[in-house]
C-alpha cells in the first residue's frame, strides 16, 4: 500500500506562498528601487519552494496572517543555495 505525501501548503502554520509573474516582479522591484538579489533569499531546496515549483530567479510573495495588521506580506528571491553556492557546470 503506497502512502500519500501530505501537502505542506495545506498545513495551518504554513502561510500562503505564490510566485510573482514577470510583470508583478518588475513592478515590485521598480517600486522598491532594488535589484532581485537585494530581497531576502529563499533556497530552491526549501520544501514550500519545491511545492509551488518556483525556479531560481523567481520572486515569491508570502502572505501571513497577522493579529495586529490583519495580514503581512513578505517577498523572497529564490536562489540555488543560500549556504553553499553550487559550482557552475562546465559546458
UniProtKB/Swiss-Prot annotation:
Keywords: Cytoplasm, DNA-directed RNA polymerase, Nucleotidyltransferase, Transcription, Transferase. GO terms for biological process: transcription by RNA polymerase II; transcription elongation by RNA polymerase I; tRNA transcription by RNA polymerase III. The keyword Transferase applies. InterPro entries: Arch_Rpo5/euc_Rpb5, RNA_pol_subH/Rpb5_C, RPB5-like_sf. Signal peptide: none annotated. Its EC number is 2.7.7.6. It is an enzyme of class 2 (transferase). GO terms for molecular function: DNA binding; DNA-directed RNA polymerase activity. It comes from the Archaea. It is found in: Cytoplasm. Pfam families: RNA_pol_Rpb5_C. The keyword Transferase applies. It catalyses: RNA(n) + a ribonucleoside 5'-triphosphate = RNA(n+1) + diphosphate. One of its GO terms (cellular component) is cytoplasm. Belongs to the archaeal Rpo5/eukaryotic RPB5 RNA polymerase subunit family. DNA-dependent RNA polymerase (RNAP) catalyzes the transcription of DNA into RNA using the four ribonucleoside triphosphates as substrates. Part of the RNA polymerase complex. This is DNA-directed RNA polymerase subunit Rpo5. It comes from Staphylothermus marinus (strain ATCC 43588 / DSM 3639 / JCM 9404 / F1). The lineage of its organism: Archaea, Thermoproteota, Thermoprotei, Desulfurococcales, Desulfurococcaceae.
Amino acid at each position: 500500500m503506497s502512502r500519500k505525501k501530505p501537502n505542506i501548503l495545506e498545513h495551518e502554520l504554513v502561510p500562503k506562498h505564490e510566485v510573482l509573474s514577470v510583470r508583478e516582479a518588475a513592478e515590485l522591484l521598480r517600486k522598491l528601487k532594488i535589484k532581485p538579489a537585494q530581497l531576502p533569499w529563499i533556497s530552491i531546496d526549501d520544501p514550500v519552494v519545491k511545492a509551488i515549483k518556483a525556479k531560481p530567479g523567481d520572486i515569491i510573495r508570502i502572505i501571513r496572517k497577522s493579529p495586529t495588521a490583519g495580514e503581512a506580506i513578505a517577498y523572497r528571491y529564490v536562489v540555488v543555495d543560500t549556504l553553499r553556492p553550487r559550482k557552475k557546470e562546465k559546458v
